[in-house]
Amino acid sequence: MKIVVIGAGAWGTALAVNTAGAVEAAGSDAPRHQVTLWARDAALVKAMQAERANTRYLPGVALPGNLLLQGGGETSLAEAVSGQDLIILATPVSAARGLLQSLQQASVPVVWLSKGFEAPVAAVPHSAPSLASFGLMVHEIRAQVATDLRAGILSGPSFALEVARGQPTALVAASEHAEVRDALVAAFHGTSLRIYASDDIVGVEVGGAVKNVLAIATGLCDGLQLGLNARAALITRGLAEMTRLGVTLGARAETFTGLSGLGDLVLTATGDLSRNRKVGLQLAQGKTLAEAVKSLGHVAEGVYCARTVVQRAAGLGVDMPIAQSVVALLDGKLRPAEAVAALMGRGPTTELA
């Protein structure tokens, strides 16, 4: 199978490395797939070609010799996707609309890895690009700009570094098209990646987006040293918020007990490699949002989509007090201790409400 990964950030590079390193059978040296990693940044592409490593986004990981590296003005997006069997979009949500518009005539499956909602410019620090609309998940953007595209999402609990190293990881391939799900299983299911299929693309997308916001809250909780009891309560009640929003948007409740819901939430909220968790930890230390984001050097999608999640929930009448507290913190309207007091001071209710 010929596979092109668009976007050479940490996750795109990791998936390309893992897939390029897969072989036909145990004991064989024959590559299972022909994999291309494409990026717009000319300097990044040249550096990867020269060093056979992505030291900017995934340092310490060697790029396999059979991984093709393209882009940077030498190879256009159209040229990169031509003749491929599967197109993977490993870019931030902010790039999804433009890419899907460019690929709307693609005759092969197009699958994204990004987790989040489009966000208004005012909610995004550091001068994010203007967007045509906001509040949409990628499958909703696709419905607007590329209705005939056979598309899906690959999601679940997955730190890029562990995927690149070939450590065991389980993911969900979600699409309303069975052929897209089958293509993802054929492409990635192997010795280190286990792929589960789902047709609940709404649930898988909501889980992947909302967990980033909740991970900021959990990082804050741990940074304030509120204890393991508080962390467990926050994750559990956060899962309830995620499920309420997802079901209201048309997802199945059981999806949120799976890899793309509970699994991804636990990993992102507690794992030390989590960017969103790091934002919460730094806010707890008294750093400003701008300082926290700048120190990451990478995108933390929870910062970019938190307000959109809350706005979407409010428009649907969905109660999300933890997510609301995160937005108030990011906006500087609440201090960490005040956010904790506000959450603990809410009136009693039943657990499943």
Curated annotation (Swiss-Prot):
What PROSITE patterns does the database record attribute to this sequence?
NAD_G3PDH
Q: Does the keyword Nucleotide-binding apply?
A: yes
Q: Taking the first listed entry, what is the main subcellular location of this protein, grouped into a coarse class?
A: cytoplasm
The record's annotation in Pfam families points to: NAD_Gly3P_dh_C, NAD_Gly3P_dh_N
The residues listed in the UniProt record as binding NADPH, with positions renumbered to this chain, are W11, R40, K115, A160, R275, V299, E301
Q: In which pathway does it act?
A: Membrane lipid metabolism; glycerophospholipid metabolism
Kindly list the places in or outside the cell where this protein is found, as annotated in its UniProt entry.
Answer: Cytoplasm
Q: Name one GO biological process term.
A: glycerol-3-phosphate biosynthetic process
> Which UniProt key words apply to this protein?
Cytoplasm, Lipid biosynthesis, Lipid metabolism, NAD, NADP, Nucleotide-binding, Oxidoreductase, Phospholipid biosynthesis, Phospholipid metabolism
Q: Broadest EC class? A: oxidoreductase
- What EC number is given for this enzyme? 1.1.1.94
User: Main role?
Assistant: Catalyzes the reduction of the glycolytic intermediate dihydroxyacetone phosphate (DHAP) to sn-glycerol 3-phosphate (G3P), the key precursor for phospholipid synthesis.
Q: Which family does it belong to?
A: Belongs to the NAD-dependent glycerol-3-phosphate dehydrogenase family.
**What protein am I looking at?**
Glycerol-3-phosphate dehydrogenase [NAD(P)+]
